């Protein structure tokens, strides 16, 4: 990883015909903390990366500072013809408090006005409309090793069911597959 081309190796591997011809999308999960691995993943992304943030002011500040810093440090790679992906921000562990709503509004304002960076191009960071609420169903899904959209199809609470939330997120991230996702939603999250 620390070789001169270390940060570009994953990008080069993913451009092999084995990947280009057989996969519509490749999703890579990373720890998120600043690391060479995170930089490799960002440089390998062809369209966008998803950054998750909790609606707590210190977390939001650290997310903006850390994410923007990583992206700004990778700007010189554009001179090598490597475009940087857009950062799509997903709010995770949202709750029903006024403080969380206020924090989310502040984050949205920072992103919409582009106050996160003087170096990154306009629109480099955006905020997804879908929010993942801090609900037990997500913990249950993790503990059971099951996708939450199969565990909770309907809900009586104010926030959407896990199925509707995952459908919204999938449609927002991959609008080209919305019709297929709509079919999955209509079938209660079960593929036909």
Where are these regions (language model features)?
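Generic alpha-helical secondary structure signal
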Residues: 9, 36-40, 143
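Conserved catalytic-core segment of NTP-binding enzymes
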Residues: 16, 20-122, 126-127
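C-terminal lobe/tail of nucleotide-utilizing enzymes
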Residues: 80-192
